[in-house]
Amino acid sequence: MSGLIGKKVGMTSLYDTEGNLLGCTVLEAGPNVVTQVKTVEKDGYKAVQLGYGERREKNATAAAIGHFKKASTTPKVKTHEFKEFEEELKQGDKVDLGIFEEGSYITVTSTSKGKGFQGVVKRHGFSGVGESTHGQHDRSRAPGSLGGSSTPSRVFKGLRMAGRTGGNKVTTENLRVVKIDKEKNLMVVEGSVPGSKGTYVILWK
């Protein structure tokens, strides 16, 4: 499975050939550097590790610097391993948007926006206990009863409650590639991609 590491640039709108307005996401992807090639004989499985984004050497560990020097490249901010990569590659090779085609469908994995600690209304879409009347107050966003008193006399595991929201790994499938600009390393896909501007993303072919 081929892929690339990139980051989210932002959103825009484009018209298709039929005049429909499409909400699109702009992604910057590549060029990625092959930082390691894993083989069945040496590592037990076949995979290619790609690196993306420049990191200053003073901010990298000695182990990381040595790892990237083997590939004759500078330290990278982000690395990712792609198993069963379609192309035959070796350390130091560069991979760009040429592996994708306009009109094809891709899968994107990224990190969703972190919302912090949120209540049940925002986190799970609860409607609240009800109107703030009949003697009630400050109950319009409350979760309500958590469980029965006699039966089951406990709170079930997995009950939806308040807690930390967002900041999760999210995979979005079947995003259509609308446009590719190889010179600027930009790709435009139809639809939304989780995360804020600058979020690192993994593109799967």
Where are these regions (language model features)?
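Extended basic (Lys/Arg/His-rich) segments that typically form rRNA-contacting surfaces
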Residues: 1-205
